[in-house]
Every structure is written in C-alpha cells, then in structure tokens.
Amino acid sequence: MAEDGPQKQQLDMPLVLDQDLTKQMRLRVESLKQRGEKKQDGEKLLRPAESVYRLDFIQQQKLQFDHWNVVLDKPGKVTITGTSQNWTPDLTNLMTRQLLDPAAIFWRKEDSDAMDWNEADALEFGERLSDLAKIRKVMYFLITFGEGVEPANLKASVVFNQL
C-alpha cells in the first residue's frame, strides 16, 4: 500500500460569538433611532438576526484552508460574511464596503441531519482566509441567522492544514 506522504496536521479554529461587539453595534442602532438620526452613507447597521463573530488565528503563517465545520442543531440557515474591518467600533463604524464577497451560506433542511452549503462560494471564502491569516491576528464575521435559528443553535469553525 502506497502512502500519499505524511499526514498534514490540522488546526480547527472556532468562530466565537463576540457578545461585546454585537452589543456595541446594537447600541449604535438604538442610539440612531432615539436621536432620530440616519446612518452614515455606506454604514452597515446590525440587523436583529445578525451577530458578530471572531476568529482568533492561533497561527498566522503557513495555513491552507481545508474545510468549514458548521453544525446547526436544528433546521435553519446561516450566512457567514467576512469583514475587512480591524474593529474599534467605538471609533469606527462598519461600512458596507468592508463586507467581503462571497459569503458562505449553510443550511439544514427540516427532514435532514446533514448540512448543505453553497460549496463554490464557501470554498473561495475559506481560501481567502488563509491569505488574510498572514496579515491578521483576528478576523471578524457577520453571521446572519435565518429560518428560526439563533447563535445558541450554531457551532462553527474553520479547519486549516498546517504547511
């Protein structure tokens, strides 16, 4: 039996709900409503079904995207959108131009335990994360929850091969 070479070590890096940042962005929306003000041109306001997540790169160099590991514990849908924002929301508002394309969309149907996803876009997005890891220690994401799921129903991580 021939071997394909040495097994690559993998790193499974979780996407973690950033409760403080999510709260800060929700306060921005409330503040604008209370004062009767409008958002800045191009500003992205957090919608009720969106939360901010972060990925702390425990290693920045020599990472190759392998796969997303996304599980919903009930039927529903999540859209994971990366941001180019290095966040200081008390100083800088998130702008729509800082949202990265493509987004990765994952869903679980009512009659299935299996997860489905938009494979090509999710793969392209994941491969971009390998490049972003070289210049970032932290990456932020907007996750949009749909069809009855919320943060408590999601477990998500990105798996990289160490080169």
UniProtKB/Swiss-Prot annotation:
Name the predominant localization. Answer: cytoplasm
| Any coiled-coil regions, as ranges | none
Expression sites (tissue/organ): Uniquely associated with mature olfactory receptor neurons.
Purpose: May act as a modulator of the olfactory signal-transduction cascade.
Task: State the Gene Ontology terms under molecular function.
Answer: peptide binding
Modification sites for N-acetylalanine: A2
**GO CC aspect terms:** acrosomal vesicle; axon; cytoplasm; cytosol; dendrite; dendritic knob; neuronal cell body; nucleus
Alphabetical keyword list: Acetylation, Cytoplasm, Olfaction, Sensory transduction
Name the encoding gene, please: Omp
* Subcellular localization: Cytoplasm
Assembly, per entry = Interacts with BEX1 and BEX2.
InterPro entries in alphabetical order: Olfactory_marker, Olfactory_marker_sf
Determine if Plastid is one of this entry's keywords. no
Q: Which Pfam families match?
A: Olfactory_mark
For this entry, the protein name equals: Olfactory marker protein
A Gene Ontology biological process in which this protein takes part is: sensory perception of smell
According to its UniProt record, which protein family does this protein belong to? Belongs to the olfactory marker protein family.
Tell me what organism the protein belongs to: Rattus norvegicus (Rat)
